[in-house]
C-alpha cells in the first residue's frame, strides 16, 4: 500500500489527496507519475525517521525520473539520509550528483561544507593540522558557493569565513 494512503494526520492526508488530484489533471507521463509517487512516499518516510524505507523509495524514484531538476532533489534527499546516518562519503557523492543536474542547490553546497568542516574538526582532534586546513579550505569553498547563490542565508557560515579570513 502506498505510504500516502496510510499517513495518519489530517495535513498529510490532505496533501496526499491534493497531490493525487494534481497527478491526474496535470499532463505527465506514467514514468513521471511513478517517480513522483515514490518521491512523495520517500519524503513521508524520511520525515518520520524511517530512513531505510525513504532510501528505498528514493532509489525507486530515480529509475523513471528523467528530468534533471526533479532528479537533483531526489539525489539531494538521498544525500541527506546518508548524512544523518553518518555516511559522509556517500552523502558527498549524492550531493555532487545532485549538483551535476542542478547547480543551483545552495543547501547541497552548505551540507557539503558542513561535512568538510566536521572532517576538519576531526583532523584537529587527531592532531593533523595539515589535513584539518585542507578540509577547512574545502568547506570554505562550498560555503562561498552556497552564499553566492543565496546572499543573506548561511549567516553562521559567513561569520566563520570572516573569522577564519577565508572570505574575500
Curated annotation (Swiss-Prot):
Keywords: Chloroplast, Membrane, Photosynthesis, Plastid, Repeat, Thylakoid, TPR repeat. It is found in: Plastid, Chloroplast thylakoid membrane. It comes from the Eukaryota. Belongs to the Ycf3 family. GO terms for biological process: photosynthesis. The keyword Repeat applies. The keyword Metal-binding does not apply. This is Photosystem I assembly protein Ycf3. Essential for the assembly of the photosystem I (PSI) complex. May act as a chaperone-like factor to guide the assembly of the PSI subunits. NCBIfam families: PRK02603.1 (NF002725). HAMAP family: Ycf3 (MF_00439). It is a peripheral membrane protein. GO terms for cellular component: chloroplast thylakoid membrane. Pfam families: TPR_1 (PF00515). TPR repeats lie at residues 35-68, 72-105, 120-153.
